[in-house]
């Protein structure tokens, strides 16, 4: 009796093929789903910045929310290949000046001034909780 033609091998092969047919598309599509989630998270953060009524400080100069979002979008385009998580986006595109190293700050409606990193990480956490 050949092993390759035995009933047990045929059953195992059949089970493996069935598994691949049923679960293969989901497994193969996972990276695309991850990229889609990353894109959605980043777009949410950019919209969050743009639609806020906050003032942004970059190198000690005040900017509108729209200007801040546009600046972050440009930095995102420059670092796209290095950004694998929303936290990477915040760290690379929305935290500090590449030239001076100075942190970005956000002046909230109540006058409190916090780093853009802390503000955006909090916004990201809220977004994730709402996605559950």
Regions from the PLM with identified roles:
Residues 26-34:
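Sec/Tat signal peptide C-region and signal peptidase I cleavage site
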């Amino acid at each position: 009796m050949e092993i390759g033609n035995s009933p047990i091998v045929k059953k195992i092969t059949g089970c493996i093929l069935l598994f691949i047919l049923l679960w293969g598309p989901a497994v193969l599509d996972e990276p695309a789903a991850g990229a889609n989630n990353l894109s959605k998270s980043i777009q949410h953060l950019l919209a969050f910045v743009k639609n806020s009524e906050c003032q942004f400080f970059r190198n000690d100069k005040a900017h509108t929310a729209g200007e801040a979002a546009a600046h972050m979008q440009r930095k995102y385009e420059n670092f796209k290949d290095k950004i694998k998580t929303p936290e990477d986006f915040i760290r690379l595109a929305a935290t500090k000046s590449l030239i001076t190293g100075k942190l970005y700050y956000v002046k909230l409606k109540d006058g409190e001034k916090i780093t853009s990193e802390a503000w955006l990480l909090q916004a990201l956490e809220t977004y994730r909780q709402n996605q559950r």
